[in-house]
């Protein structure tokens, strides 16, 4: 009968949708694991060599004396995600714009600098002790091979760099607290924030404290919530430690420091040759020896993802 055929067709359609959703979920997980493996450095690799493959022009500006390391992350508004990178320095670097009382980009003209009139124009002090930080997260792409003439770079975000170290530290703590609150707020509204206790009264107290903390943040802003309050709620609610989670991701997607790499030394290489003594079989056979170099960067063994990839199926 027609209604039986329609019912069977509906069952087949539902079964096909279940199979399609399961396959799509598996494919998305496999794609994410692939992108995660691309940035799985774990404190390995020479930073300048890594940046050279990403942006050769920027790699020429890197100085090993600055103690540089490169960090990667996944991001973007679509899936598959984009890979972003940022260069960090962990040695003191003096910035002239942040420590000198002058805006060198707006120097007075020569004819006004020698003017001895009584009615001199007051010097504009705007921009003094001011620095703009342009070292943001940028996507890994092949656009550096193309000409940038006539191209508009979108989302070029500039972050301010305060000259006071205390102010920079306070801003960093405020940003870390905001990230924790947003993380807890997102888990709370998605229903993934679970309490560690099974006692009914304790669950009620935890739920009330979490709800009050989020409401105080939404009404009064970030200054109305203390960081220790957020830590207490996170300790009572979720088994996932936020700080350990962030530290783990930073460890995964961070290269080695340029301070750990030294240049090639001819004396050391010559000493290694003398240490062979009478055994020159390796040198005659042309077998490479890693003792000639103090550090050797090995390119990670990765595969390119294509639409035809089936991940072993």
Swiss-Prot record:
This is Protein MFI. Enriched in the pancreatic beta cell and the testis and is expressed at low levels in other tissues tested. The keyword Ribonucleoprotein does not apply. It is found in: Cytoplasm, Cytosol; Mitochondrion outer membrane. GO terms for biological process: negative regulation of mitochondrial fission; negative regulation of protein targeting to mitochondrion. It comes from the Eukaryota. Acts as an inhibitor of mitochondrial fission. Interacts with MFF and prevents DNM1L recruitment to mitochondria, promoting a more fused mitochondrial network. Can homodimerize. Interacts with MFF; the interaction inhibits MFF interaction with DNM1L. One of its GO terms (cellular component) is mitochondrial outer membrane. Disulfide bonds: none annotated. It comes from Homo sapiens (Human). Keywords: Cytoplasm, Membrane, Mitochondrion, Mitochondrion outer membrane. The keyword Disulfide bond does not apply.
């Amino acid at each position: 009968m027609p209604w039986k055929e329609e019912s069977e067709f509906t069952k087949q359609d539902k079964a096909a949708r279940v199979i399609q959703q399961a396959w799509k979920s598996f494919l998305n997980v496999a794609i994410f694991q692939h992108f995660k493996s691309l940035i799985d450095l774990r404190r390995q690799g020479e930073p300048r060599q890594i940046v050279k493959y990403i942006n050769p022009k920027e790699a020429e500006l890197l100085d090993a004396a600055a103690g540089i390391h490169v960090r990667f992350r996944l991001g973007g508004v679509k899936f598959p995600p984009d890979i972003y990178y940022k260069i960090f320095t962990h040695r003191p670097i003096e910035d002239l714009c942040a420590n000198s009382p002058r805006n060198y980009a707006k120097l007075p003209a020569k004819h006004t600098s020698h003017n001895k009139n009584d009615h001199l124009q007051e010097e504009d002090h705007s921009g003094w002790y001011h620095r703009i930080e342009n070292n943001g997260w940028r996507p890994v792409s092949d656009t550096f091979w193309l000409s940038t003439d006539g191209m508009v770079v979108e989302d070029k975000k500039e972050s301010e760099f305060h000259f006071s170290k205390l102010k920079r530290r306070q801003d960093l703590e405020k940003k870390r607290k905001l990230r924790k609150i947003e993380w807890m707020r997102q888990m709370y509204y998605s229903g993934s924030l679970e309490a560690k206790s099974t006692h009914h009264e304790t669950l009620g107290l935890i739920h009330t404290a979490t709800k009050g903390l989020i409401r105080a943040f939404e009404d009064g802003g970030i200054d109305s919530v203390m960081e220790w309050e957020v830590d207490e709620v996170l300790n009572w609610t979720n088994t996932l430690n936020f700080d350990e989670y962030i530290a783990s991701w930073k460890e995964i997607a961070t290269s080695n420091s340029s301070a750990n790499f030294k240049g090639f030394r001819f004396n050391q290489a010559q000493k290694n040759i003398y240490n062979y003594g009478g055994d020159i079989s390796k040198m005659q056979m042309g077998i490479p020896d890693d003792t000639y170099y103090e550090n050797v960067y090995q390119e990670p063994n990765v595969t390119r993802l294509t639409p035809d990839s089936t991940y072993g199926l």
